[in-house]
Amino acid sequence: MKRSPGLWEPLRSMDERAVRRAADAHIQAVASGDVDEAVEYIFGEDVGKARANLARVAEVVTRAEVEDVSIKGPEAIVQFRVETSAPGHPLVRLETVWADHAGRPLLHAGHAIEQ
């Protein structure tokens, strides 16, 4: 809940289409090696650290896509399917948490999903 003058109102739910567009732009930037574009969708992490992490990931990603988007109130859960050239990890699924910042969906956290 957020406070408005004299009122309490629920936090706005995320827009699924906007989240899907942002998530797709992010993962396609990673897959194409455009680290500068990919880092624009990350919130709360040091930009230099995020850029270095994404550069390492981009080296092994061969194809990636948004697999699922589910809205959970003020957050969205986005699952990615990522194909890689990494030995022993040809397919990785990631689950990420996105939230709205000034009207723009940004990635907050993520982890690999056990297969």
Q: Could you describe each region identified by the protein language model?
A:
Residues 3-6, 11-15, 20-77:
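Short solvent-exposed beta->alpha transition segments
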Residues 50-101, 109-115:
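Surface-exposed, charged secondary-structure patches
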